[in-house]
Each structure stands twice: as C-alpha cells, then as structure tokens.
C-alpha cells in the first residue's frame, strides 16, 4: 500500500491497528496522520518495541492490510461494475 493510499485510509485501518496493538487509541493513530514513521514511533513507544522491531511488525501489518483491502476492493469493484452493466442493459432495451 503506497503512502498516499495509507494516509487516505487511516480511519479504516485504525480499527485493524487497535486489534493488533491494543494499547493504541484512535486518537493516537489519528495524530500520526498516516505518517508511517510517526506510526512506527507510536508502536515503538506504546508497545515497548525496539525501533527495528516496530518497523518490521508495522511493515508486515501493512502487507497484510494491503492484501485485505485489495481483495475487498476488487470484489466491491466487481459488484459495482455488475450493477452498472445491468443498468446499461435495462436502458438499452
């Protein structure tokens, strides 16, 4: 997930972050404004991990989230396209 997409989806991702690291609050997460370095520092501080371990875990988390959002996005996109096709079909008859 690239940086801009991550920053745009921070609200959606916030719940997943709290599931993984319960010590994080929505407020903490929102203050990072989707900045990966700030988020890594937050995980490091709140969870008590080394800088390297926090970065590693956050990177793994983002890979998992990216897969989740990608697969969800594709199925939602497929549904939307299907509805659009159905509407076009109705209008053409």
Swiss-Prot record:
It holds the Pfam family CsbD. PANTHER family: UPF0337 PROTEIN YJBJ. InterPro entries: CsbD (IPR008462), UPF0337_stress_rsp (IPR050423), YjbJ_sf (IPR036629). Belongs to the UPF0337 (CsbD) family. This is UPF0337 protein Bd3330. It comes from the Bacteria. It comes from Bdellovibrio bacteriovorus (strain ATCC 15356 / DSM 50701 / NCIMB 9529 / HD100).
